[in-house]
Amino acid sequence: MDIEFVRSRFIKHFDGKTGNIYASPGRINLIGEHTDYNGGFVFPGAVDKGIMAELRPNGTNTIMCYSIDLKDRVEFKVDDPKGPRASWARYIYGVVQEMRKLGVDVKGFNTAFAGDVPLGAGMSSSAALESCFAFALNDLFGDNKVSKWDMVLAGQATEHNYCGVNCGIMDQFASVFGKEGCLMRLDCRSREFEYFPFKPVGYKLVLLNSCVKHELAGSPYNDRRNSCENVVKHIAAKHPEGKFETLRDCTWEQLEEVKAEVGEEDYKRAHFVLGEKDRVLAVCEALNAGDYETVGKKMYETHEGLSKEYEVSCEELDFLNDIAKENGVTGSRIMGGGFGGCTINLVKEELYDAFIADAKAKYSAKYGKEPKVIDVVISDGSRKIC
């Protein structure tokens, strides 16, 4: 993101004066999919694409916002009980209200912002926007007294209370806590986390966006969550002495005990979740050892599980995964909820050009459009630029 680009738009729209510039990143998740609501681990990292915003207090009770990308301007009062209608502005409004709840005395300000997080790629542009403004308001009006975790929760509460999205905490967490050259293992239950080195010399990390999103009948995500909860319920009934909140608390042996009772579909879904828990821990060991071949192997295993057991893949994503295998890509898998979106690929630099060319050619020949190529580098989280 270009600082001068954002600054020039800010100056143009707000009296020719400059303010402070802040940035927050989007994110990837290397491994640990559909584990958050099962009490497991996720493995995100902040990336070199995000949101950049310039802010300056304006001495009033009015917040004036300009979206550079949308060329849209919205203003609202700090204490407006309803907030703006524009969906993009509600993220800023929500963060303002949540930071006020945390004791930050937010006053009126002018802001212009832009982003280079590709929309529809599952890289959490909304979390980047929330994190950017939470960080900025904490700096401008809160004397930086609000903790990073409270900023994460303010972003999550913004989604819940003002934008109608019942999200977890991974996206905001990655945007706020991101660290250059490191991925983070986050325990979704305890919120404990640990940094792991991710410096794959000789490799590139690239997303291939299938540019499809399949709308399925019913509630596919709720169905899978219900499957997992059903398995836990059956295991808990067999082991009344234990404490079983989620599949995180269950063993392979206990899953096998209830296989006949829960049915094949629920069994397969629970089998994936337990396997994913083990894969995340294996990736932790591999990263500490600098063993990226094992990391890649586990990525392929996750894709296989998401496709065949959890059944959240689609023809296009499986096709991209097959192309990765054919081209000797070290690791490839679905990233995100599934039914469309991206694959995330760990590929050796010497194979990169041939892989991308082959993926574009074959995907275009089969589906009539090229996948979008998104190169990413693991980068720092929310920060003040100047």
Identify the function of each model-found stretch.
Residues F339:
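Glycine-rich phosphate-binding loop
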Residues M1-R27, M52-R85, C182-G331, L346-C386:
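C-terminal nucleotide
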Residues A128, C342-L346:
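FabD-like malonyl-/acyl-CoA
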Residues G39-A46, R224-R225:
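Short Gly/aromatic-enriched secondary-structure transition segments
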Residues M1-Y22, I28-G32, Y37-F41, F76-D79, ...:
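Gly/Ser-rich oxyanion-binding loop with an adjacent helix/lid
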Residues T111-F113, L208-S210, T343:
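A structural signal for short, well-ordered beta-strand segments
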Residues P44-A46, E54-P57, G103:
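Short, charge-rich binding segments
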